[in-house]
């Protein structure tokens, strides 16, 4: 869940203009001035209540700002106890690298240390935003190379080449070729030992995509061992072809991720939210790529639903979409949550309202004090029963995060809904709001400070230190050779095709 901390400030600025419209009307001016003042005070209190989690350490040195970051997170990171985080141990582990970066005045080394520190927490809501150029990026510990292929692990355990370039195909490695070694190591061993920790919350998700990351790791050259068409091992040396493209292409194909190359692409993605259509004469299709109302630019409807625990506006949109599909002959439905960017869990609950006639616990908003959790507001699913008998498959993946993670969980509780995917949801759903700007503004770290709990009083989705998914898919979509070729070579939406076939059967 991501609630913008600055919406109250925007609201205050706009509210201040309202009395001007009634400047020549004595009664109207008094009334609007009173309510404007009241709303301004409320918005001010809301912002001030959030402000303690904003920390500016930009005037301090690398070492001092890093130590301050650790202290702030030790006090305010909402999942410190849940994930059993030892901040003192992490500070001791990464402080030498930070001190070296300070001695050498090396911003990239500082960035690396902070990023690796953040990744140790395995929280999808923790980020380290870094201000570096393309040349500095090449020195990053997370720099990726381009060797003209990517790799994916099948359910069988085999690792195959995908998205192969012409330079690689000439050497005998084609889409579907089994890769056995990477730079002299068994390929899965190399994926486990050499791929950096990217902070992915669910370890099973990280393991699944590790070969894709591995395909971009090496030096100016990399030795790749594969099985030729006769089944014999061959080894070739691949050269770095420049800027990394293939690994990104493979990840986009695997997650069915949208392209964000232009502002128009991003707007198209947002415009698809809440959209619906018929895939055939029986199967409806609903996209939910963010739990926000794009028709609400000020965010007031979003916030109203959050505060009231009831998103009536979203529920009415869902009701309209589903009734339109029903009128076109819908007998079953696919809800697409893949790459869901999150927002407000109440929107996910509003969809569930229509798909059940039962009462279900949704989320509990709480506070953390002295390492203890206290729930202060319960939000739930209040079934209307309108589509309680509609068979539904909800597609999710490792890029479905935050409120999308929550929506995956809530939908999976309904008996007529099957949560499915090749991977599990991301594994994070706490409220963001903690921000710390480090030395010189080189790195800004964000992390969650608001608590979202389940009915037992613990974080509702987020993984513990074991990194085991707590809202796994109910049905794992198979990934065999044919599926991989459909995804990576033919660029088909294999998961969606699978979902339709599943519902038909």
Model features per residue range: what roles?
Residues 5-6, 10, 19-20, 26, ...:
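C-terminal "post-core" interaction segments
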Residues 2-332, 501-505:
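Flexible, low-complexity junctional segments that flank or bridge functional domains
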């Amino acid at each position: 869940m991501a609630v913008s901390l600055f919406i109250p400030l925007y609201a205050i600025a706009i509210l201040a203009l309202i009395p001007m419209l009634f400047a020549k009307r004595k009664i109207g001016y008094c009334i609007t001035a009173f309510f404007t003042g009241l709303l301004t005070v409320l918005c001010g209190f809301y912002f001030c209540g959030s402000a303690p989690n904003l920390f500016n350490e930009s005037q301090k040195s690398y070492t001092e700002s890093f130590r301050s970051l650790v202290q702030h997170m030790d006090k305010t990171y909402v999942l410190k106890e849940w994930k059993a985080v030892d901040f003192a141990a992490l500070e001791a582990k990464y402080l030498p690298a930070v001190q070296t970066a300070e001695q050498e005045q090396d911003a990239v080394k500082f960035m690396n240390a902070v990023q690796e520190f953040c990744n140790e927490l395995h929280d999808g809501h923790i980020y380290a935003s870094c201000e570096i150029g393309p040349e500095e990026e090449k020195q990053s510990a997370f720099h990726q190379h381009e060797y003209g292929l990517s790799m994916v692990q099948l359910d069988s355990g085999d690792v195959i080449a995908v998205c192969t370039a012409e330079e690689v195909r000439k050497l005998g490695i084609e889409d579907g070729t089994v890769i056995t070694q990477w730079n002299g190591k068994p390929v899965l061993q190399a994926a486990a030992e050499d791929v950096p920790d990217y902070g992915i919350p669910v370890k099973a998700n990280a393991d699944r995509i590790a070969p894709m990351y591995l395909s971009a790791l090496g030096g100016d050259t990399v030795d790749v061992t594969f099985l030729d068409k006769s089944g014999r091992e061959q080894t070739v040396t691949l050269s770095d072809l420049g800027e990394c493209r293939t690994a990104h292409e493979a990840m986009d194909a695997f997650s069915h991720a949208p392209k964000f190359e232009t502002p128009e692409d991003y707007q198209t993605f947002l415009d698809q939210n809440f959209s619906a259509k018929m895939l055939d004469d029986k199967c409806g299709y609903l996209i939910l790529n963010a739990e926000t109302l794009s028709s609400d630019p000020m965010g007031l409807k979003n916030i109203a639903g959050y505060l009231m625990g009831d998103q009536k506006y979203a529920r009415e949109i869902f009701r309209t979409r589903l009734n339109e599909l029903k009128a076109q002959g819908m007998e079953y439905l696919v809800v697409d949550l893949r790459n869901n960017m999150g927002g407000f869990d109440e929107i996910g609950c509003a969809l569930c309202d229509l798909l059940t006639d039962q009462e279900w616990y949704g989320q509990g908003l709480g506070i953390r004090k002295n390492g203890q959790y206290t729930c202060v507001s319960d939000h739930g699913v209040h079934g209307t029963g309108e589509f309680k008998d509609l068979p539904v498959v909800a597609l999710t993946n490792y890029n479905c995060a935050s409120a999308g993670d929550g929506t995956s969980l809530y939908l999976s509780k309904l008996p007529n809904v099957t949560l499915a995917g090749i991977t599990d949801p991301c594994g994070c759903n706490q409220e963001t709001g903690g921000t710390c700007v480090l030395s010189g503004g080189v790195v800004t770290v964000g992390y969650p400070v608001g608590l979202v709990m389940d009915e037992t009083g613990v974080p509702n989705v987020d993984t513990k230190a074991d990194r085991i998914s707590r809202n796994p898919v109910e049905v794992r979509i198979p990934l065999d050779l044919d599926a991989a070729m459909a995804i990576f070579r033919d660029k088909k939406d294999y998961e969606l095709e699978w979902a339709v076939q599943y519902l038909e059967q």
